[in-house]
Curated annotation (Swiss-Prot):
Disulfide bonds: none
Protein's UniProt name: tRNA pseudouridine synthase D
Annotated keywords: Isomerase, tRNA processing
HAMAP family from the UniProt entry: TruD (MF_01082)
């Protein structure tokens, strides 16, 4: 298995170094649900601004304030503790009376707005996130500048970030131990983290091998192609390669890579043979995913940051803004820009 730090770069290994998250204000995340509260219903959507506290901690504090069980407060995704983040929480509070959430007080947390909503906010039910990052102590400004320009055109590898694998790769190591011993894992959180790490590592490996090819975005026979921004996909055939290549070049279609698991991976012929060869040595992790009935899926191979802009405060400090769809990692963008000091694993997804 390729170590995360050794995964293939799309734009070559960065020449410069820099510091990511010198302080929480250097990593700002604003959650984009893609919809507005209904204005009625038994749930309350609460938009919060937090700094220095994790999502679960705030959710538990909100439940205590509302005098409801912690399981009645949900969220679309975890946000980093060591960052300034805006996100929505959802509390189930039936009844016509609206509680005064302006009275909710928690150090490092502020209620920005709240409104009634008809449905529970479920994990993953967001459109994406807007990021504002500040990179400090940047060396080789010219290299970083050129990479930003290139990323606007060619994107970055859609790798799962190091945080998916846990501090020191602990989640992936747990998955490997589980696969090797076949000992039942009772803890539901561990099961989820370990299976996710296993599948993510296999995806990263497939993408890393594909990036070694001369023309990364060249459609091959049997590729599974996805409409940009959609989850559905279809298989490329030799008769239509030229037209499909044009649509890929126009970013209308995206080449996908496998999220291995049980069932068919989705690719066929040449593309399927390539993917199978890329992870052929990882038989234990593949067997674990099949045994635990984790269904195979597809994920875009490349990621195109939207609304990408940047501003150099001085020769060694740059502010970068961009928007990413749900499930994508800001650290996978930063990885193509600079060699960062520190460990990504503490940064929440």
């Amino acid at each position: 298995m390729i170590e995360f730090d050794n995964l293939t770069y799309l734009h070559g290994k960065p020449q410069g170094t820099g510091l990511l998250k010198a302080n929480p204000e250097d990593f700002v995340v604003v959650e984009d649900l893609g919809f507005e509260p209904d204005g009625e219903g038994e749930h309350i959507l609460v938009r919060i601004l937090k700094n220095g506290c994790n999502t679960r901690f705030v959710a538990d504090a909100l439940a205590k304030f509302l005098k409801i069980h912690a399981r009645e407060v949900s969220f679309a995704g975890q946000k980093d503790k060591h960052a300034v983040t805006e996100q929505w929480l959802c509390a189930r509070v039936p009844g016509k009376e609206m509680p005064d959430l302006s009275a909710f007080q928690l150090e490092g947390c502020q209620v920005l707005e709240y409104a009634r909503h008809k449905r529970k906010l479920r994990l993953g039910a967001l459109k994406g996130n807007a990021f504002t990052l500040v990179l400090r102590e940047v060396s080789n400004r010219d290299d970083v500048e050129q990479r930003l320009i290139d990323i606007c055109v060619k994107g970055v590898p859609n790798y799962f970030g190091a945080q998916r694998f846990g501090i020191g790769g602990s989640n992936l190591q747990g998955a490997l131990r589980w696969a090797q011993t076949n000992t039942p894992v009772r803890d539901r959180n561990k099961r989820s983290f370990w299976l996710s790490a296993a599948r993510s590592a296999l995806f990263n490996q497939i993408v890393a091998e594909r990036l070694k090819k001369a023309d990364v975005n060249q459609v091959v026979d049997g590729d599974a192609l996805q409409l940009a921004g959609r989850g559905s996909w279809f298989v490329a055939t030799t008769e239509e390669l030229a037209e499909l290549q044009r649509r890929v070049n126009d970013k209308e279609l995206m080449i996908t890579a496998a999220l291995p698991g049980s069932g068919e991976w989705g690719t066929q012929r040449e593309a399927l043979a390539f993917e199978q060869a890329a992870v052929a040595a990882e038989t234990e992790l593949q067997a674990l995913l099949v045994r635990e009935k984790v269904e195979a899926a597809r994920r875009a191979m490349l990621l195109y940051p939207q609304q990408l802009s940047w501003n150099w405060w001085d020769d060694v400090t740059v502010e970068i803004r961009f928007w990413l769809p749900a499930g994508s990692f800001a650290t996978s963008v930063v990885r193509e820009l600079i060699n960062t000091t520190g460990d990504y694993a503490h940064i929440a997804e």
